[in-house]
Amino acid sequence: MEDYKQRIKNKLNVVPMEPGCYLMKDRNDQVIYVGKAKKLRNRLRSYFTGAHDAKTTRLVGEIRRFEFIVTSSETESLLLELNLIKQYQPRYNILLKDDKSYPFIKITKEKYPRLLVTRTVKQGTGKYFGPYPNAYSAQETKKLLDRIYPYRKCDKMPDKLCLYYHIGQCLGPCVYDVDLSKYAQMTKEITDFLNGEDKTILKSLEERMLTASESLDFERAKEYRDLIQHIQNLTNKQKIMSSDKTIRDVFGYCVDKGWMCIQVFFIRQGNMIKRDTTMIPLQQTEEEEFYTFIGQFYSLNQHILPKEVHVPRNLDKEMIQSVVDTKIVQPARGPKKDMVDLAAHNAKVSLNNKFELISRDESRTIKAIEELGTQMGIQTPIRIEAFDNSNIQGVDPVSAMVTFVDGKPDKKNYRKYKIKTVKGPDDYKSMREVVRRRYSRVLNEGLPLPDLIIVDGGKGHMNGVIDVLQNELGLDIPVAGLQKNDKHQTSELLYGASAEIVPLKKNSQAFYLLHRIQDEVHRFAITFHRQTRQKTGLKSILDDIDGIGNKRKTLLLRSFGSIKKMKEATLEDFKNIGIPENVAKNLHEQLHK
């Protein structure tokens, strides 16, 4: 199976069963088709299974990858689909388009207007509302309004009263001289409702329900109650499109397994025209990571500052304002809050997809290590150990090692190292120290040696490791280096005395395995570094507090783990773990200075 087909197959397995839009892309990464679905997974799978007509078969033959955006409802999917089609103008949306268009509700431009469901928009003949995702939702909305407002129903004015008049659903303008101002008020209320303003109609129905109930007309009161519930179920708040034309960017994020995904929705003229997805291995707290990201997002001249930036409420508004020179909004409720939540939900879906794909890819790792061994000219590397350093300007330098056996992570054999002999930010010496410590212990304890050692770095890192292995420890183990491009993505595998590039195809299983290894060792190293910095910061604070010695420091660290948790603790919390009252009081005061 061709590699792109396998990637598509893998991704199909992790698409959620939620409403949303999907974008099909060709070999040039151009959007060639945009669609919507009530259940994304089912719809996307349908393209790659079973028979199709000639046009759809041609479309599927050009697809090399796809993306999707989760929405909160089928209606949102429709509106987003229309925006995306307008933005990208995919050629297959034109080729596959038939005579069927989306339904609208129309208020006719007549002396006594009517409500219609139509798929044809003719300018100057009335007001149109929609589009609706399907005819059923449009008809249900019209039926609801017909029950509430006695609007004219007949196409042509009859010469006698019809059934609708006798059941209270028409004022009978065909026979009676109906007050035009009363009709105009009905038209206004219907227009407001179709524009999303349902408060007026709900208030009116609630008043009618209360009046009927007080008059002991419980059957009529129940009818009004049912209408209220029907409106609440039918009214679908639109988050993707808005009448608010303010230019804004909406941020949401999710954190899991040492990774952070940030989603940005670009809202222009009330429409979401684009979204940006960024994956970041966590090196700081999630809040600190977000502040760094959003500052770079606008300061590197990659994006134009909008009028407003919307962010989650857990973040420090002043901190963001210090790096982003525009209005910062943290919505507490309503459609704007819903949009921030939707961005966060899409971030969660993206992270879940990343982890699911990694898990599924493990089934093909044997082929990957065989391919890797062949390309490097070494025996199949059953056991691979990879190293990476982490520090900030030489502060609290650490290193980490991950182990892959048969191409799969062997987490019980992961190791963490605090750099002991190197002063300042010296990556080469740090790598030499860690490799020396690791394989000295392996030799002393008779532990298994790896078939391949991978370092995160280039020729300098490789030469340092080879020197320690061969000249200090007498070991002959293949050593390779992994380099990243300016986007911090795995780009090249280096091997040999002159650190030559190993010719691996970027879409090969071997290259993808290397990408996974580099991601994993980087994640493991920076997670350890963050933990080390937090503990170091906590210890330095504790050192300045009277009554806190080594034993009590250890007790506090073991009980609370972080300065944030200690600041949240009460005096009783400190006393409950054995800290004397006077020391606990002093500690509490110092932490809250």
From Swiss-Prot:
A biological process from GO: SOS response
Domain UVR: from-to ranges: 199-234
Domain GIY-YIG intervals: 17-94
Location of this chain's protein in the cell: Cytoplasm
GO molecular function, one term: excinuclease ABC activity
SMART domains (UniProt xref): GIYc (SM00465)
Pfam families assigned: GIY-YIG, UVR, UvrC_RNaseH, UvrC_RNaseH_dom
Source species, domain of life: Bacteria
Keyword annotations from UniProtKB, A to Z: Cytoplasm, DNA damage, DNA excision, DNA repair, Excision nuclease, SOS response
GO CC terms of this entry: cytoplasm; excinuclease repair complex
The keyword Membrane is assigned to this record: no
Subunit structure comment from the entry: Interacts with UvrB in an incision complex.
Role played: The UvrABC repair system catalyzes the recognition and processing of DNA lesions. UvrC both incises the 5' and 3' sides of the lesion. The N-terminal half is responsible for the 3' incision and the C-terminal half is responsible for the 5' incision.
UniProt similarity note: Belongs to the UvrC family.
Protein name per Swiss-Prot or TrEMBL: UvrABC system protein C
Source organism: Staphylococcus aureus (strain JH9)
Gene that this sequence comes from: uvrC
